Amino acid sequence: SALFLPMVLLGLHHGLIPIYAVQLEQMGGVSLFPVLSMGGAGQVGAAIAIYLVARKVGNKKMQGIITGALPAGFLGVGEPLIYGVTLPMGKPFITAGIGAGFGGAYIMFTQVMANAWGPSGLVAIPLMQGATGMLNFLIGLIIAYIGGFIVTKLWIKDSDVREEEENFETTNVEEKY
């Protein structure tokens, strides 16, 4: 799960679907999907940490981006947080992956299996096998949220989130040509 986000960037996560299908057929459930779902949860935790720092330093633009992208993140759509927040900042993209790793490790330890695959995040809870699987998946999400939050909070500084002053050239177009 810690390495899932770079796969998303490259679109390689779609290549895992045949593996899910083979697991479902041969094992009666999918073990890889619940683990990889933690990638988005790490993003959510990292984004919440960044939001708190952005509020502290007065970066309204970042607060707005996170506020708009966070609901989708909780529902398992991580791309708005990846492309709008963590990847442009750099370090939080890594810290989100580390947080995801904690949740993924818990999912593997508790052997959560899914009956199918689909969106990740909170909406994936009903896809897990049995009440225990659903509960452990939820606990894994919470661990990844908290892991992403803590690692990001420890790693970023106020200066990483402070809004940069915009410097636009005011050169007349006619002067250039």
What are these regions (language model features)?
Residues 1-2, 64:
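Alpha-helical transmembrane segments of multi-pass membrane proteins
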Residues 3-7, 38, 71, 138-142:
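Hydrophobic alpha-helical transmembrane segments of multi-pass membrane proteins
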Residues 18-74, 78, 85-89:
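Membrane-embedded helical hairpins/re-entrant loop segments and their flanking transmembrane helices
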Residues 2-13, 27-30, 72-75, 107:
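Transmembrane alpha-helix interface/packing and boundary motifs in multi-pass membrane proteins
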Residues 19-23, 50, 57, 68, ...:
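Transmembrane alpha-helical segments and their short flanking loops
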Residues 3-15, 56-60, 88-94:
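Membrane-helix interface "capping/anchor" motifs
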